[in-house]
Amino acid sequence: MDLTVTNLACARGGVTVLERVSFRLSRGAALILRGPNGIGKTTLLRTVAGLQPAVAGEISMPPEAVAYAAHADGLKATLTVAENLAFWAAIYGTDRAARAIERMNLAALADRQAQNLSAGQKRRLGLARLLVTGRPLWVLDEPTVSLDAASVALFGDVVRTHLAEGGAALMATHIDLGLAEAEVLDLAPYRAETPAGTEPADDPFAGVTA
């Protein structure tokens, strides 16, 4: 299933920040959002993922087809790496936990509690959830935060495999994942006109990636 976004408008803090956004993302393709901080990259990603309503426009893909990864890893601290992935696999109704451990190079950490992982290891575990979901569209908001160069390269390989298997990826990232096939969408032309005195309120997502 392709993702088609048509005349989408998104709001942050009750104020529209993007409008008339339209694009199509096909199976096997990746699209990287670009724009200055505060333009609304995170807001757009959250809207496509179904985490907040659109102000206007249409999104063709239902939230049930989307796997979303942002800054919070969503780990259960007292569960081991393997138990966290088994928990997510049960939620999503898949049997992909073992594959996720292998693909994200977590085998040596499988029996370690999440609370005892380094920041980079926690990030790899959080991203491993994408593999567990079995969902075709990955929506990624700065997915490489806390990852070292080797882990960035590893995750780039994981994304390429996802695309080769017919998945798609929509992301905001300042790090090169080595996705030569990825297209770029500059959000500057879609910035909404903001009346004086109605600037969007600060939110926990805007400071780093929006």
Swiss-Prot record:
Keyword NAD: no
Stated role: Part of the ABC transporter complex CcmAB involved in the biogenesis of c-type cytochromes; once thought to export heme, this seems not to be the case, but its exact role is uncertain. Responsible for energy coupling to the transport system.
InterPro entries referenced in this protein's UniProt entry, alphabetically: AAA+_ATPase, ABC_transporter-like_ATP-bd, ABC_transporter-like_CS, ABC_transptr_haem_export_CcmA, P-loop_NTPase
EC number: 7.6.2.5
Name this polypeptide is given: Cytochrome c biogenesis ATP-binding export protein CcmA
Top-rank taxon: Bacteria
GO MF annotation terms: ABC-type heme transporter activity; ATP binding; ATP hydrolysis activity
Residue ranges of every copy of the ABC transporter domain listed in the record: 3-209
Entry binding sites for ATP: 35-42
NCBIfam families: ccmA
Alphabetical UniProt keywords: ATP-binding, Cell inner membrane, Cell membrane, Cytochrome c-type biogenesis, Membrane, Nucleotide-binding, Translocase, Transport
Reaction catalyzed: heme b(in) + ATP + H2O = heme b(out) + ADP + phosphate + H(+)
Subunit-structure text: The complex is composed of two ATP-binding proteins (CcmA) and two transmembrane proteins (CcmB).
Membrane association type: Peripheral membrane protein
Provenance organism: Cereibacter sphaeroides (strain ATCC 17023 / DSM 158 / JCM 6121 / CCUG 31486 / LMG 2827 / NBRC 12203 / NCIMB 8253 / ATH 2.4.1.)
GO cellular component: plasma membrane
Principal subcellular localization: membrane
The keyword Cell cycle is assigned to this record: no
